[in-house]
């Protein structure tokens, strides 16, 4: 370019570095119904003002970079940039702030959780000006959520397929999770289903290993399902894990499951990836398969309170990507989960409309419109003494999954399943009669022991088993 020639793009261009807050901190901004809203927990480096830190997050997760570039003049930054529109200190924490950021909808590809996360939780998490950064919540506008299929079927369709109403569903993860042959694995599946469970489950790391190849497992589990159905008169299922090293192999396994006529398959959605998960969800919708989702690897992302991403965000992402069940913690078992916080994201999974409620960790009102709901799965270190609390906490629209709490029964797998089914039926009956499960739970279980020797034996084995540790991730002090 000659010294005399000046383009429109270069007319107002001045090279150099500007403070992010000059362009990306806009407290006067009024959010739009179509904006994706994010709440970030920001811990700035010493000497970095919170406004600059919040603006940096908005910039680096949208249109900004570390220096002024002349190509800024070739587009409308005001139209496309993220905006930090509010910052508030975190009560009880030093040098932590919640930064609220609004993103224009045009920044995101329709129907792609992958693209949404690549922007919002991409490189910005390694930004040096921040000591730590955590995405606490997202508001997904209906204009964006309607571009997703969501769960393949949803809660009501699943109940209709299974012909099971008015109670939580019961499951069991087959143990040991690794090392069984396919035939012995199928035997355990049959015994649990015959004893009264609705589902059994592959553990998250059961894929296709030398001791048990996936096709053999699928065949023996299908045989177990059909035999148990014939003997009990109930529809049964086993979560056949279709997770694989490639999307093509994953779909091949799902196709084989469909050919066997089983009702449900499974996917590890975080280790498998959102693109693979969405592909499988579309296949399941088109072919009548339910989809169970395991959240393996979630604690790497969500457990630390000041860095990463809260599970409520992963739960919303799963509902958009697609899944009929997802593991959600137990509150009372061996895995992380505070009660009010857990119930907050359980409602985000199941309900159509959820009001903002900071007492449960919900930062934004969320309207899912007509997107089907997801059944939360309570699993991990639970047994028959937990049944009243689980029934009271999670309600009917849930799956209560007992692995060791079924297979660890002193009389075997089928009696373990019987004990869990009897305990559940007793709790549902007591609740329907108006009894207080939280206060009378142990008494209800003891009464049921009088006519179920299987339950009595289970109660004796697990009467002293508790997991009383403080959760790492708790709600903020009010």
UniProtKB/Swiss-Prot annotation:
Compartments, record wording: Plastid, Chloroplast
Record protein name field: Ribulose bisphosphate carboxylase large chain
PANTHER family membership: RIBULOSE BISPHOSPHATE CARBOXYLASE (PTHR42704), RIBULOSE BISPHOSPHATE CARBOXYLASE LARGE CHAIN (PTHR42704:SF15)
E.C. number: 4.1.1.39
HAMAP family from the UniProt entry: RuBisCO_L_type1
Active site: 175, 294
Enzyme class, spelled out: lyase
Gene that this sequence comes from: rbcL
Cofactor(s) needed: Mg(2+)
Family the UniProt entry places it in: Belongs to the RuBisCO large chain family. Type I subfamily.
Chain's role: RuBisCO catalyzes two reactions: the carboxylation of D-ribulose 1,5-bisphosphate, the primary event in carbon dioxide fixation, as well as the oxidative fragmentation of the pentose substrate in the photorespiration process. Both reactions occur simultaneously and in competition at the same active site.
List of residues that carry N6-carboxylysine: 201
Positions bearing N6,N6,N6-trimethyllysine: 14
């Amino acid at each position: 370019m000659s010294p005399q020639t000046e383009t429109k793009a270069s007319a107002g261009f001045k090279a150099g570095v500007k403070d992010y807050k000059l362009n990306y901190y806009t407290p006067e901004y009024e959010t739009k119904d179509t904006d994706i809203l994010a709440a970030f927990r920001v811990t700035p480096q010493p000497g970095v003002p919170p406004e600059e830190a919040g603006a940096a997050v908005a910039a680096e997760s949208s249109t900004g970079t570390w220096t002024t570039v002349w190509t800024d003049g070739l587009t409308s930054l005001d139209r496309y940039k993220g905006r930090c529109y509010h910052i508030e200190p975190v009560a009880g924490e030093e040098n932590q702030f919640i930064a609220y950021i609004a993103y224009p909808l045009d920044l995101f590809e329709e129907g792609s959780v992958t693209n949404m996360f690549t922007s919002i939780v991409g490189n910005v998490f390694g930004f040096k000006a921040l000591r730590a950064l955590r995405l606490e919540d997202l508001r997904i506008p209906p204009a964006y959520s309607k571009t997703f299929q969501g769960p393949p079927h949803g809660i009501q369709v699943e109940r209709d397929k299974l012909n099971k109403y008015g109670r939580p569903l019961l499951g069991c993860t087959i143990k040991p999770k690794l090392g069984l042959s396919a035939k012995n694995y199928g035997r355990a599946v049959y015994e649990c289903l015959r004893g009264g469970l609705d589902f059994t489950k592959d553990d998250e790391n059961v894929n296709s290993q030398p001791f048990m190849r996936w096709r053999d497992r699928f065949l023996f589990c299908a045989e177990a399902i059909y035999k148990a159905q014939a003997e009990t008169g109930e529809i049964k299922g086993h979560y056949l894990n279709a997770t694989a090293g490639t999307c093509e192999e994953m779909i091949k396994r799902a196709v084989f499951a469909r050919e066997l006529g089983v009702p449900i398959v499974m996917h590890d959605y975080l280790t498998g990836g959102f693109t693979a998960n969405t592909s499988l969800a579309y296949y399941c919708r088109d072919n009548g398969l339910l989809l169970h989702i395991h959240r393996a690897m979630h604690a790497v992302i969500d457990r630390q309170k000041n860095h990463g991403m809260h599970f409520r965000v992963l739960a919303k992402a799963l509902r958009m990507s697609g899944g009929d069940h997802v593991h959600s913690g137990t509150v009372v078992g061996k895995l992380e989960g505070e009660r009010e916080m857990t119930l907050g994201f359980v409602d985000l999974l199941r309900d159509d409309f959820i009001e903002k409620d900071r007492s449960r960790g919900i930062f934004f009102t969320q309207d899912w419109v007509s997107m089907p709901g997801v059944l939360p799965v309570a699993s991990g270190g639970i047994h028959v003494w937990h049944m009243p609390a689980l029934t009271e906490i999670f309600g009917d629209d849930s799956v209560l999954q007992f692995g060791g709490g079924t297979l660890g029964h002193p009389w075997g797998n089928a009696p373990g399943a019987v004990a869990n089914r009897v305990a559940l039926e007793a709790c549902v009956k007591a609740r329907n009669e108006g009894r207080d499960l939280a206060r009378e739970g142990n008494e209800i279980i003891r009464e049921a022991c009088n006519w179920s020797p299987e339950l009595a034996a289970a109660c004796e084995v697990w009467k002293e088993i508790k997991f009383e540790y403080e959760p790492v991730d708790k709600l903020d002090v009010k």
